[in-house]
């Protein structure tokens, strides 16, 4: 049902890449621009993610991003992280586009 422009996909993937790079480098500050200030992670404040990534430090992991759907100003992506400190994860991120561009509003994840 996507009606997005190529620019939307590029901006969505950029937000995802900021998150992935922050995970890989163990740098919560690096991923902050990808997230809305009121974003949540599994229902908790997003600062939990930033603090956890920084505390964990760099990780030798691989990631894949799939844009599942984009409709007007909302999108859903799936991020698969392999070997993030020895575990594999699947995330779903809900994004919303506003005057500041595409921002992740919510992140849910599970270990697989």
Label the predicted regions.
Residues 4, 8-11, 40-92:
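Surface-exposed, charged secondary-structure patches
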Residues 1-29, 33-37:
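Short, low-complexity N-terminal intrinsically disordered segments enriched in polar/charged residues
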Residues 88-112:
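Short beta-strand edge/turn micro-motifs at domain boundaries
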């Amino acid at each position: 049902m996507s009606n997005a422009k190529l620019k939307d996909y590029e901006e969505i993937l950029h937000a995802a890449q900021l998150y992935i790079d922050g995970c890989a480098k163990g740098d919560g500050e690096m991923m902050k621009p990808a997230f809305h200030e009121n974003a949540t992670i599994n229902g908790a404040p997003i600062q939990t993610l930033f603090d956890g990534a920084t505390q964990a430090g760099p990780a030798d992991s691989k990631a894949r991003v799939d844009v599942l759907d984009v409709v007007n100003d909302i999108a859903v992506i799936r991020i698969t992280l392999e070997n993030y400190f020895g575990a594999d994860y699947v995330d779903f991120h809900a994004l919303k586009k506003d005057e500041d561009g595409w921002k992740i509003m919510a992140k849910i994840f599970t270990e697989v």
